[in-house]
Amino acid sequence: MIRAIALKEWRLLFASPLAWVVLAFLQLVFAWVFLSRLNTFLELQPQIAATPGAPGLTEIVAAPVFGTATIILLMVVPLLSMRLVAEERRSQTLPFLMSAPVSITQIVLGKFLALLGILALAVGLIVAMCLSLTFGGRLDLGLLAANALGLLLLAGSFAAVGLYLSCLTAQPLVAAVGTFAALLALWLINISATDPGSLLHVLSLIQHFETFSKGTVALKDLGYYLVLIALFLLLSIRRLDADRLRA
């Protein structure tokens, strides 16, 4: 049933021009950054070749694309997640969905997986661009995989927060603004912290991605994203459960 809900949401997302416009915009930005970094690498290649231990294609070209993607997704995910529940609440179809023979958990997971599927497609496009470099150079596949995993987990966290905010209102625009504000707060929460071990650093979304961007997959960073995703999915379930009880 989760799969059926996810496929339905996937079709609805792609039925609107927004998903296509967003994907086209993402690919345009990613391609521009990719080609810009590739041009920089080609200009620096003589110096790189003469320097032992110099950074390679992955560090100079691929990693910056993933870094740029974090900022772009911060702005884009609120637009994709805003209608997941808010639109159904506004059009008054949410009571019909909740009265169907499916659990609230299945509804929430289905909607989340549909959005995550689109974000995974965006991450896959970046990976495909970076893999094209293997035709003319050598890539650090471990570093590439760590960046891709980190970006996917970060995008999943964005999606979970966006889904929860969409559960709170009947206005998609309000959900989008609220999601962006919440994500930005979690992004910048450590800006005033001086101690790397402080709670503000631990709670920062981008702080954990930086570990992945260096090629390290640490259990604490995996755990952070998975716990954050699970927390906001649980909050979404609790919110819709409360709505079902009131209905």
Predicted regions and their residues:
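Selective transmembrane-helix segments that form parts of the transport pathway or gating/packing helices
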Residues: 17, 73, 77, 102-132, ...
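Membrane-interfacial helix-loop-helix connectors in multipass membrane proteins
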Residues: 128-151, 211
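Long, hydrophobic alpha-helical segments
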Residues: 61-87
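Helix-loop-helix units of permease transmembrane domains in multi-pass membrane transporters
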Residues: 84-114
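Hydrophobic alpha-helical transmembrane segments of multi-pass membrane transport/permease proteins
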Residues: 17-41, 68-76, 181-185
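Terminal transmembrane helical anchor/hairpin motif
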Residues: 36-60, 178-247
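Aromatic- and glycine-rich beta-strand/loop motifs that create alpha-glucan
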Residues: 1-23
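Hydrophobic alpha-helical transmembrane segments of polytopic membrane proteins
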Residues: 146-171, 228-233
